[in-house]
UniProtKB/Swiss-Prot annotation:
InterPro entries: Dimethylallyltransferase, IPT, P-loop_NTPase. It comes from the Bacteria. It comes from Bacillus licheniformis (strain ATCC 14580 / DSM 13 / JCM 2505 / CCUG 7422 / NBRC 12200 / NCIMB 9375 / NCTC 10341 / NRRL NRS-1264 / Gibson 46). Catalyzes the transfer of a dimethylallyl group onto the adenine at position 37 in tRNAs that read codons beginning with uridine, leading to the formation of N6-(dimethylallyl)adenosine (i(6)A). Belongs to the IPP transferase family. It is an enzyme of class 2 (transferase). Its cofactor is Mg(2+). Keywords: ATP-binding, Magnesium, Nucleotide-binding, Transferase, tRNA processing. Transmembrane segments: none annotated. This is tRNA dimethylallyltransferase. Disulfide bonds: none annotated.
Amino acid sequence: MNKTKPPVIVLIGPTAVGKTKLSVMLAERLNAEIISGDSMQIYKRMDIGTAKIREEEMNGVPHHLIDIKEPTESFSVAEYQEIVRQKIAEIDRRGKLPMIVGGTGLYIQSVLYDYSFTEEAGDPEFRAEMEAFSAKRGAEYVHDLLKERDPEAARAIHPNNKRRVIRALEILHTTGKTMSEHMEGQRKELLYTTALIGLTMEREVLYDRINSRVDQMMDEGLLDEVKLLYDENVRNCQSVQAIGYKELYAHLEGRASLEEAVETLKRNSRRYAKRQLTWFRNQMDVAWFDMTPPVNIEQKKQEIFTYIAGKLEL
């Protein structure tokens, strides 16, 4: 193993593919600590909708970057990058392996490569113009502009993530480069000795699992969880733009029946899974492992362990 570069395991994959359970099994065997690579699990009191791991499921494996922010607080990829790099150093010093687990591709990528999140390639005047467009015509209008000019970024960035949509347009306007080209220009080499594992699944099977997971979330009390945030007056915040929250907000505000909101949630979750896979395949050099049932989880764990051991020279 390259001793100058700390070892890091990264386990990625779309929502509902089975990352959580497998990550704990691997962490137990590898003496690893898990860092959440999900941009929404950072928020307190947002447990069901973000599919946050329960304490009893952790099996004593330390988990980081969960429940660190109030739902009213914003959180950026630059902040994530800084905190996670500190965590990796801390875990490495303890003689344990850091394992990043999640589905927010840009967040994970920002940690692994030496991306700079300064105001380089910034144009405050253009940004203000786009913000005015968004306020006047809606987030979808600005996202459609991005879709015309940088389809890949548009697929990776949710329309309601206004700040990131505008930033992608700003980079294009200032540099003439797409978001990916701009980041590729910064992407010299990995900062860590990295074993990058991806879990995938046949699309129809994955979509069925997503639909079932949404039904399970509703049974577990997702509507009550969202209503608590709504009653706390958590509005127009980054946190409740998350899938699972904005759809049920539409119901609570009388813009959709509960049945319509749940169907929209399922559809948005399926689309998000598709965007996640597109991002990972286009942006990252991943060793993919198929989790389509029937799958022998112990055998799959062994295959992944063997890959990690070879990659990190364990």
